[in-house]
UniProtKB/Swiss-Prot annotation:
Family the entry assigns: Belongs to the GTP cyclohydrolase IV family.
Class in the EC hierarchy, top level: hydrolase
The entry's keywords: Hydrolase, Iron, Metal-binding
Residues marked May be catalytically important (site): 165
Entry's EC annotation: 3.5.4.39
UniProt name for this protein: GTP cyclohydrolase MptA
Residue stretches spanning the membrane: none
Subunit structure: Homodimer.
The protein's required cofactors: Fe(2+)
Record lineage: Archaea, Methanobacteriati, Methanobacteriota, Stenosarchaea group, Methanomicrobia
InterPro entries xref list: GTP_cyclohydrolase_FolE2/MptA, GTP_cyclohydrolase_MptA
Cofactor note: Binds 1 Fe(2+) ion per subunit.
Length: 317
C-alpha cells in the first residue's frame, strides 16, 4: 500500500506583513571544495567560501534558500567533468542557475573567496617555497525583459609585497652626503658611493589588489593579475630566505622606492599593456594598502575606471 505524499505549505510564498522589496536574500559562509581543471596541468584544489544571494519581490515572505545549495552543487559537479574551468566561470554559472531556480527573482549574486598557493623561489639561493595569495571572483546575473539572462563577472587577487619610502630615503641620502663631505671624502667619490649603495629608509608591507569586471566570454588571466601586483611594489617577498636572499630582497626594495600612489599607477600601466584583448567596457579596480612601520596609520591609494579610460589617459600622457 502506497502512502500518500504529504503536501507541505510553501510558507515563503505567503505575502509578508510589510510588503517591500529586498535587495539581497541568501546565504553566507558556505564552504565548498572546488576543483579547477587546467589544460595539461594538475588541477587546482581550493577550499572556497561563497556568498549567494537573490533579490526578493514585495509579495513574497521569503526565498527558498535550499535552491541556492542545489544550484551550487549542480555547477560544482559539472565543473569536475570539464577539461578547463575558471573560478569566474563557476560563479557565472551558479548565478544563472539561481535565476532559473528562483523564478520570482530578477537578480542574483555569487561571491567566492579562496586562498591560492603559488610556487616561488628565493632570489639568490633559488630555494623553492610556497606563497599564499587571496583570490576572489563574483558574478551578477540580471533577468532581462525578454527572458534572457545577462551576467557580469569579476575576478581579482590580493598580493602582499614590500615597499620602501622614497621621502625618508632622500633625507637619509642627504644626511649621508653631508657626513661623508665632513669626513673629507671628495664630492665625486661621494656621489659614486650614493649612486651604488641605496640609502636606508622605512619600509611597509604592501597589499596590492586588482579586480576586473567583464561581460560575456572575455577571459582574464588570474596568474597575470598576480604577476602585475607583485611587480608593482618595491620588491616581492618570499617566505623562505637565507642570508644571501635577504640581502638581495632588501637591496632590490631600496633601489626601487615607491609611494603607495606609485604602486597603483604602475599596476594601471601594466593592466593596460597586459590585457590588450579585454574590451574598453571592463571595469578596473586597483587598490594599494601600505602598512606603515613608523606610523600608526596605513597609507591607501585607489583607482576605479573603465579600461578604455585608463588606455586613453596612459596613451595621451
Amino acid at each position: 500500500m502506497e502512502l500518500p505524499i504529504a503536501q507541505f505549505p510553501d510558507v515563503q510564498a505567503n505575502r509578508p506583513k510589510i510588503p517591500i522589496n529586498l535587495t539581497r536574500v541568501g546565504v553566507t559562509g558556505v564552504k565548498k571544495l572546488v576543483e579547477i581543471k587546467r589544460k595539461d596541468k594538475r588541477p587546482i584544489v581550493l577550499i572556497s567560501t561563497f556568498e549567494i544571494f537573490v533579490d526578493l519581490p514585495s509579495d513574497r515572505k521569503g526565498a527558498n534558500l535550499s535552491r541556492n545549495f542545489e544550484a551550487m552543487d549542480e555547477v560544482l559537479e559539472k565543473a569536475i567533468n570539464l577539461p578547463v574551468y575558471e573560478i569566474e566561470k563557476l560563479c557565472n554559472d551558479v548565478a544563472k542557475s539561481l535565476l532559473r531556480r528562483h523564478e520570482y527573482a530578477t537578480r542574483s549574486e555569487v561571491r567566492m573567496k579562496s586562498e591560492y598557493v603559488v610556487k616561488r623561489e628565493a632570489p639568490s639561493t633559488k630555494m623553492k617555497c610556497q606563497e599564499v595569495v587571496d583570490i576572489f571572483a563574483e558574478a551578477t546575473a540580471t533577468r532581462l525583459e525578454d527572458g534572457d539572462i545577462d551576467v557580469k563577472k569579476l575576478i581579482g587577487a590580493e598580493v602582499v609585497g614590500m615597499t620602501a619610502c622614497p621621502c625618508a630615503q632622500e633625507i637619509m641620502r642627504d644626511n649621508a652626503k653631508t657626513a661623508l663631505r665632513e669626513l673629507g671624502v671628495g664630492l665625486e667619490t661621494v656621489m659614486n658611493f650614493l649612486n651604488k649603495v641605496p640609502m636606508a629608509t622605512h619600509n611597509q608591507r604592501g597589499r596590492g589588489i586588482i579586480s576586473l569586471e567583464v561581460s560575456g566570454d572575455v577571459d582574464v588571466s588570474l596568474e597575470t593579475i598576480i604577476r602585475i601586483i607583485e611587480s608593482s611594489m618595491s620588491s616581492s617577498i618570499v617566505e623562505l630566505l637565507k642570508r644571501a636572499d635577504e640581502a638581495l630582497v632588501v637591496e632590490r626594495a631600496h633601489q626601487n622606492p615607491k609611494f603607495v600612489e606609485d604602486c597603483v599607477r604602475t599596476m594601471a600601466q601594466n593592466i593596460v599593456s597586459e590585457f590588450a584583448h579585454v574590451p574598453d567596457s571592463a571595469l578596473v579596480t586597483i587598490k594599494q594598502i601600505n602598512e606603515e612601520s613608523i606610523h600608526r596609520h596605513n597609507a591607501f591609494a585607489e583607482r576605479v575606471a573603465l579600461l578604455g579610460d585608463l588606455r586613453d589617459e596612459i596613451k595621451n600622457n
